[in-house]
From Swiss-Prot:
Divisome component that associates with the complex late in its assembly, after the Z-ring is formed, and is dependent on DivIC and PBP2B for its recruitment to the divisome. Together with EzrA, is a key component of the system that regulates PBP1 localization during cell cycle progression. Its main role could be the removal of PBP1 from the cell pole after pole maturation is completed. Also contributes to the recruitment of PBP1 to the division complex. Not essential for septum formation. It comes from Streptococcus pneumoniae (strain Hungary19A-6). GO terms for biological process: cell division; regulation of cell shape. Keywords: Cell cycle, Cell division, Cell shape, Coiled coil, Cytoplasm. The gene is gpsB. This is Cell cycle protein GpsB.
């Protein structure tokens, strides 16, 4: 990561040589004033974010470590019921499709069934 070359003070105190056909001094000064304001804003933002990072790291260090994997000895009853009903529903759909394949022609040929 490269280091910061200029501070807001460096930009403010920068002197430029004068030439006959140069830029407007007023426009350059106004532009540099805006650049200085941006630098000050970025510096404050970086300081704030570094403090936030430090606070979050401290908070993380204080919290007990929790396992991310659920305990297999205590499955959630809602999850078990949902997966069971989905499995039953899937089985019924497959059974229906197989019956149509196997008995479909017989049902179409014999309308009494």
């Amino acid at each position: 990561m490269s280091s910061i070359i200029f501070s807001a003070k460096d930009i403010f105190e920068q002197e430029f040589g004068r030439e006959v056909r140069g830029y407007s001094k007023v426009e350059v000064d106004e532009f540099l004033d805006d650049v200085i304001k941006d630098y000050e804003t970025y510096a404050a933002l970086v300081k704030s974010l570094r403090q936030e990072i430090a606070d979050l790291k401290e908070e993380l260090a204080r919290k007990p470590q929790v396992s991310s994997a659920p305990s297999p000895s205590h499955p959630d009853p809602i999850d078990v019921a949902a997966s069971s009903s989905m499995t039953n529903f899937d089985i019924l759909k497959r059974l229906n499709r197989l019956e149509k394949e196997v008995f479909g022609k017989q049902i179409l040929d014999n309308p009494d069934l």
